Every structure is written in structure tokens, then in C-alpha cells.
């Protein structure tokens, strides 16, 4: 929950570092994965501008439909500290409780016996109760505006210092809002993008419905982190090859934080007439990434496949089924997809359909980096043919890379790729 734009933090004074265990400077600113993930099942998954609605397995959630205290098996109070965001955190139900349909996080200037601070505010964290590595997080929430207000939906690593203190440990801010602004912010923090003042160059403002609930979605994969508001993609932070942990500390578990902060750091002083501030959270839902996705390209984009070599594009001609397929042109060309969540010592089949534009050409479907020797199968027909490979993951391997590879010049097409657990 750092402040996101450099110009927003120039006037802020850096103070002590602390974020539970990962020293963050905040003065500135239900069911197992389906065994087969096939073809048309992922139609909506990787649309470039809208969030996925299929192929995700719900693994953790809180609907906040009770009254009184929050579920202590899932959350604990966000502790008060010495940095801006947690300066007024208060571990009392008056500041973090359920109202029958929402988690209500409140901030006011009420007098609390035995706690003589100017303001009291609420927040919760899932640290020690739930954390995740890769997946989709949906939070539906609304909040009030006011001078000095600072609600946020964000994540920090657990263990906290796997890659050092803040910001090297990493931070994912799905939503931050300050004061009366008509925009909210998505931000990434790490040792590469966070400057000395606590601001980040990996930040994006986005409009939102200022008077009602909004759905804030974060999709985190081994390749990138994507932020959506109301199912519309707003910002993507991509992993850089060779960037190391300074650029990508995002391969360890992170836990969730929801808070209504204010009165220090980025938003500045509170105008008491604007109190109380509150953030109402309708639900939090966390989903596991599918093993394999976008095998049919009906989304119209290549993601989460990556490309290298000649030209790779999704086209609306020559599809085997549906209306789209992948086309590779030019010289040596490949598309690849990095898979996570595989089971060690387990056999899978990866396959698909392909055709070449002229006799004598060929294209391969294969898998590598799974704990064994790369294997592939060749297709050289001018009409769609199916081929596949089987592979068994190593004793400690949970990842693999599948590919569609054209070794020479020419044009080939691919469609309806699939992954099966045997």
C-alpha cells in the first residue's frame, strides 16, 4: 500500500519501515482442478480486455453474510504500527465487523477509553490463516470518499522476507484510493520499480463507480500480474526475462489485507467534517489457476502463450472448430505455455490439432522442462490432424512448458490444444 506515483510522494517524508514482518515504508504515498482442461472450455479465459469467468477453481472465500465479528479462522485484525497506513489501526469490532452482508471497515475520531489517539481505523489480514501463490482474487467493495481517507485491498508475502525487506520482498496493491479522487490505483512494489520515496513506476490509475460497489480482480500467473475493475483490464505488470527477484519476487505465497486507513502519508491530513470513512466489502473470492488454458484461441489473443521466432497470430480463418486458431508464419517459430500446479510423478497427455499450408512442411507439438527429456510429435498434413505426447513429471516437478513449434519457413495452423491427466 505504497504510494504509487512519484509526484504524489515527493512531499511526503519517509518514516520507519514496517509491514508486519516485511519492513514496508508506508509514509508515502471448492473442489479439485478438473483433470482435463480442453479446447473450448477456456473460451473466456484470456480475453485481453475482460476478466476470465471460466476454468478457475474456487479455493477460498468469505461472503461476509453474518453479523458481528469477522470469521477469526480466516482473518485477524491488522495491527497498529508506526507507518502511515497502520498508524490508527484499532483491534475492536466497532472498526472491523460484519453487518449481515458486508465486512465493514470504519475510521472515525471517536473517543476510545484507554486509547488516546486522534483517530481509530479498521483492517483485517489473512496472514497465518491463508496465503496463495498464483491465482485469481476477486473483491467486491465500495467505500466513502473524504479528505484524508485511504482504503486499500492488497497483498504481502508470507514468509515476509524471502527476498529481503520492503520493497524487495514485493507488494501487490489491487486497489488504493485517496481523498476525493475520481480514480483508484493499481500498484506493484519491488526492488526494481519502487523509488527511494516509496513511489512506484509500476502503477496505473483507473476510473471506478464512485457511488456503488466495484469488482476488483487481480490475476497472478508466473508470467504477469493483471488488474481489472468491473471485469475490464486496466493494468498488466509483466515478468521480465533475466530480471531476477528484484523485478519478480512474486513466486512465493502472499496473504490478503483489507483496510480503511487515513490521516497520514499519501492522503494527508483528515478533514474531520468528512468522517466517518468506511469500506464495505461484499465478498472476497480466491481461485486457483487452471492447469492449461486458451487451447482454442477463441479469446482472440495468444496469452498466456508466449511467442518467439517468426510471426505468431490468432486468425479468424482456417479454424478447426469455432472461429479462431493460431497461425505461425515466417522462419523458425514457436508458441509456448508455462504450466504450474502439476502433480509430481504423474503422467499427462498434451495434444492438439494442426495442419500445414503445403506438402513437405511440418510442425511439432511437445513438452519440455517437466523433469524429463523433451518430447514432441510431428504433424505434416494439409488438413487438420491430431497428435499428442505423454510425459511423466519428475519426483519434485510441478511445472512444465508445452509448445507448438515450426522449425522451418512456411505457414502452419493449430487449434483445440488440450491437456489430460492420465
From Swiss-Prot:
It comes from the Bacteria. Residues 291-406 form the CBM-cenC domain. The active site is at 171 (nucleophile), 176 (proton donor). GO terms for biological process: carbohydrate metabolic process. InterPro entries: CenC_carb-bd, ConA-like_dom_sf, Galactose-bd-like_sf, GH16, Glycosyl_Hydrlase_16. Pfam families: CBM_4_9, Glyco_hydro_16. It catalyses: Endohydrolysis of (1->4)-beta-D-galactosidic linkages in keratan sulfate. Residues 47-292 form the GH16 domain. Hydrolyzes internal endo-beta-galactosyl linkages in keratan sulfate and in various neolacto-type glycosphingolipids, producing sulfated and non-sulfated disaccharides, and glucosylceramides respectivly. This is Keratan-sulfate endo-1,4-beta-galactosidase. It comes from Sphingobacterium multivorum.
Amino acid at each position: 500500500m505504497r504510494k504509487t506515483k512519484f509526484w504524489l510522494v515527493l512531499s511526503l517524508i519517509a518514516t520507519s519501515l514496517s509491514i508486519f514482518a516485511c519492513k514496508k515504508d508506508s509514509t508515502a504515498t471448492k473442489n479439485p482442478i478438473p483433470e482435463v482442461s480442453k479446447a473450448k472450455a477456456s473460451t473466456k479465459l484470456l480475453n485481453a480486455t475482460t476478466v476470465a469467468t471460466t476454468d478457475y477453481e474456487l479455493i477460498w472465500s468469505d461472503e461476509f453474510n453474518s453479523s458481528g465479528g469477522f470469521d477469526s479462522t480466516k482473518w485477524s485484525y491488522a495491527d497498529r504500527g508506526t507507518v502511515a497506513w497502520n498508524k490508527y489501526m484499532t483491534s475492536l469490532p466497532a472498526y472491523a465487523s460484519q453487518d449481515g452482508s458486508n465486512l465493514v471497515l470504519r475510521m472515525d475520531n471517536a473517543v476510545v477509553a484507554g486509547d488516546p489517539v486522534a483517530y481509530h481505523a479498521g483492517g483485517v489480514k489473512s496472514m497465518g490463516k491463508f496465503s496463495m501463490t498464483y491465482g485469481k482474487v476477486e473483491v467486491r467493495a465500495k467505500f466513502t470518499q473524504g479528505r484524508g481517507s485511504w482504503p486499500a485491498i492488497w497483498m504481502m508475502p508470507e514468509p515476509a522476507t524471502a527476498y529481503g525487506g520492503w520493497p524487495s520482498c514485493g507488494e501487490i496493491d489491487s486497489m488504493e484510493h485517496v481523498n476525493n479522487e475520481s480514480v483508484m490505483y493499481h500498484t506493484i512494489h519491488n526492488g526494481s520499480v519502487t523509488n527511494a520515496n516509496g513511489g512506484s513506476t509500476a502503477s496505473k490509475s483507473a476510473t471506478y463507480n464512485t457511488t456503488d460497489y466495484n469488482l476488483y480482480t487481480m490475476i497472478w500467473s508466473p508470467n504477469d500480474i493483471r488488474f481489472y475493475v468491473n471485469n475490464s483490464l486496466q493494468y498488466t505488470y509483466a515478468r521480465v526475462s533475466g530480471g531476477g527477484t528484484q523485478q519478480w519476487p512474486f513466486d512465493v505465497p502472499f496473504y490478503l489485507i483489507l483496510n480503511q486507513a487515513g490521516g497520514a502519508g499519501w492522503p494527508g491530513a483528515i478533514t474531520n467534517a468528512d468522517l466517518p470513512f468506511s469500506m464495505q466489502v461484499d465478498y472476497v473470492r480466491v481461485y486457483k489457476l487452471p492447469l492449461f488454458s486458451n487451447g482454442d484461441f477463441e479469446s482472440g489473443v495468444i496469452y498466456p502463450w508466449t511467442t518467439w521466432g517468426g510471426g505468431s497470430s490468432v486468425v479468424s480463418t482456417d479454424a478447426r472448430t469455432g472461429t479462431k486458431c493460431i497461425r505461425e508464419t515466417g522462419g523458425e517459430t514457436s508458441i509456448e505455455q508455462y504450466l504450474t500446479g502439476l502433480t509430481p510423478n504423474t503422467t499427462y497427455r498434451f495434444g492438439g490439432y494442426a495442419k500445414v499450408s503445403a506438402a513437405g512442411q511440418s510442425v511439432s507439438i511437445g513438452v519440455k522442462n517437466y523433469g524429463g527429456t523433451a518430447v514432441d510429435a510431428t504433424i505434416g498434413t494439409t488438413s487438420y490432424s491430431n497428435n499428442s505426447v505423454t510425459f511423466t513429471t519428475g519426483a519434485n516437478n510441478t511445472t512444465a512448458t508445452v509448445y507448438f513449434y515450426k522449425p522451418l519457413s512456411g505457414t502452419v495452423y493449430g487449434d483445440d490444444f488440450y491437456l489430460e491427466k492420465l
